Amino acid sequence: MNTVRVTFLLVFVLAVSLGQADKDENRMEMQEKTEQGKSYLDFAENLLLQKLEELEAKLLEEDSEESRNSRQKRCIGEGVPCDENDPRCCSGLVCLKPTLHGIWYKSYYCYKKWSA
């Protein structure tokens, strides 16, 4: 019975000491991995930041190249009064004097072009 206790005590001491060593090793490995993970995250963050800056630069470049004159100015839609001398009807519309039902109105209106 005494040998069983000694054997059990010896196995217990070995298990605790080896387990403690493994625990310290595991702690060291985890520390190294978290440091590597942080460096990887920093690298990924910097890479993403560079890509976003490039994209932003491209977008700003496109905006600066766009001329204000290249865009169509605000136009007047169909059936809306327009100025005879300065028609701003949208493309496909013409500033004409109303016929029939609109003759009592005093101004011109934007109408679709007639295709003959």
Swiss-Prot record:
Subcellular localization(s) per the UniProt record: Secreted
Any single GO CC term annotated in Swiss-Prot or TrEMBL for this entry: extracellular region
Statement: the UniProt record of this protein carries the keyword Signal: yes
Residues covered by region (Disordered): 61-83
Keyword terms: Disulfide bond, Ion channel impairing toxin, Knottin, Secreted, Signal, Toxin
Pfam families (alphabetical): Toxin_22
Tissue: Expressed by the venom gland.
Propeptide: 22-74
Cystine crosslinks: C75-C90, C82-C95, C89-C110
Family under the similarity heading: Belongs to the neurotoxin 14 (magi-1) family. 01 (HNTX-16) subfamily.
Protein task: Probable ion channel inhibitor.
Domain notes per entry: The presence of a 'disulfide through disulfide knot' structurally defines this protein as a knottin.
Name by which UniProt lists this protein: U11-theraphotoxin-Hhn1c
